[in-house]
């Protein structure tokens, strides 16, 4: 019987690749998707569809009540515009949800302990390091230190693409034969991707770097 692993799966291309990576490694993934009140709720719908198609264990957990305590992010507050441009720009800090990955990983670790799983996979990568403190190698290292002492059972947090950028993730996923039309990246909660937010810009750059056209629909195309 293969080992169980909890995969934090948003529905985006990074976690989509991580999910398949776990399966390729012969692990049994338990996908965990969080509704934290994000305006790009479409990613949850995509995650459900993918997991159903793959026959993967999947839970969608509503933690949107945290927004009674945590605010100031354009991802959860519709009164704040989602910044346009590249992630390296200072304006992209408006997309930071305070303490998000610490909260999500804490819940995922608890789920892993309950399942008897020894690892939690999540899709942090080098393109996130500039803006998101909770995607940096030092954060993963320190969270692993905490995870090692928080329970009787040790759970490792593993980010297979921590030192890869999005184009590298895409390259690996393409080598696995993955279909990225089954992913959602845009931070704006509209029917088509905007093509202008940091998440869209980075995604489009990744496809361009791999000499490909992005298979999802954009508003300006």
From Swiss-Prot:
Its cofactor is Zn(2+). Keywords: ATP-binding, Ligase, Metal-binding, Nucleotide-binding, Queuosine biosynthesis, Zinc. Its EC number is 6.3.4.20. Transmembrane segments: none annotated. GO terms for molecular function: ATP binding; ligase activity, forming carbon-nitrogen bonds; zinc ion binding. Pfam families: QueC (PF06508). Zn(2+) binds at residues 186, 194, 197, 200. Catalyzes the ATP-dependent conversion of 7-carboxy-7-deazaguanine (CDG) to 7-cyano-7-deazaguanine (preQ(0)). This is 7-cyano-7-deazaguanine synthase. It comes from Psychromonas ingrahamii (strain DSM 17664 / CCUG 51855 / 37).
